[in-house]
Amino acid sequence: MRKKILFFAMMLLLLTGITASADVLGEQNGGWSTYMGAFTYFHNVQFNSDSVGKQNEYYVEYTPNEDAVPIVVNGASIWGTRNIKQAEQYMQENGLRPLVGINADYFSFKTGIPMGYTIADGEIISKEYGGQDAVGFRSDGTGFIKWLDIQTTVTDGEKSIDVMYINKWCQAGFDPVYLLTDKFGETTKTQSECIFVICTPNEGRLHVDETMSLTVDDVFIYNGEIEIPEGKVVLLMDTSGVSEYYDFLSRLHAGQTLTVANQAVGDDGTWKTTENAVSSVGGRLVTNGVANSDFEAGAAPRTAVGIKADGNIIFYTLDGRQSGYSYGAQLKTLAKRMVELGCVDALNLDGGGSTTISAWFPGKDNTMVVNSPSDGYLRSVANYIFLKDNRERTNIPWIINITGETNNNYLSGMTANINIESVYDTANYKMEEPYNIKYRAETDTDSTVDENGAVSLNGTGDVKVV
């Protein structure tokens, strides 16, 4: 008599239906969902549309918790770009464990500098002039989307001037004052005659609604780029810039104390609570549950982030520009889709060839890029939003990867072997042997399984080994 042996461990793939309506992208005709741990689910949904054909979206729904928290990752410097695998490598080299990542802000292809605001680990590491919509994340994992406009000033105790940009490129002929830290890069990248003020930070930090005290080390004029000393702050401007600003900087001297202040214009204190944030020139997709529609036309791959009414956060990507696989979407369509997913607020991030999502799935040794970037390769971009995995080893088995003869038919009297290839604990760390796995055969037959996973098959019917 034939019988079938089935092996069941804690299964990774959840073949549950996607509950949100998906009419805006077409009729759902496939997909999958995976529980990542840390209150995080990864979804793929496949659609077919009569008007544009196939669509493939990949998104994560995250319930805020401290086992995994959203952070913004730039890499070693603001200047330059890196692809998502390089960003993950940077994280791991610095003791950070990525769970899920998506690309974030628009950026200059020439310099790699993001076009908006970036706050990382409680510090403003890139500031634009004027306001933009932005997403902020607190240390407990909660998030919000709100207008962000930071006014930065530097004062010598008597007079103050505006600092328009933090860690942006000071180009020849530009008027304003810039502030650079060693996070900008190794040098200032300046190409004209500038006045430089080298300072040592004393107290405080570059954060919203906070001040930082500086001591002036040196003031000088130089034509070209200079090194940014580690741990120092550099105030600079083109010597042909605004005379009021130039006069202020030129009067400074070594030993003088300065105060840098950053204030969120028109804010109610919300931005002071954030530890990580990124803005976007791509604009707001959803405001108070209503999809915005005032967008330029044109379908493309898309990346977005949204906040649901219950506080859950959606990290969203939609592939595009790939005939027969995924068409992409217009921004007004993306906005409607974010509403379908339950978002009350949503922000459009850099899309097109930049759209990328990666994940470290349970039972795997490293991350993998899940979507299909439209360039055909991983584009290097300015920065990313990652879920940083804070979980520590538990040594409690969760995912069991096996080899051997499973889900096959056998004759009574035969023996089948189940071999464990690897075991991952409930925090998705690979466990070392011995695994202390115990087998049990659930069956109406006389079949048995021993402590080594050898199944003796007797009788007729299915054998489930758990």
Regions found by a protein language model. Give the residues of each.
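Sec-dependent N-terminal signal peptides of Gram-positive bacterial secreted proteins and lipoproteins
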Residues: 4-22
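Loop/turn positions that initiate beta-strands
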Residues: 252-259
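Short alpha-helix capping/helix-loop boundary micro-motifs
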Residues: 235-250
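Extracytoplasmic soluble-region selector
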Residues: 394-466
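Zymogen propeptides
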Residues: 21-236
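Solvent-exposed loop/turn segments at secondary-structure junctions
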Residues: 66-67, 105-109, 142-143, 151-152, ...
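Short, Lys/Arg- and Gly-enriched loop/turn segments at beta-strand edges
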Residues: 263-277
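Conserved, well-ordered active-site substructure
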Residues: 48, 109-137, 275-343, 354-404
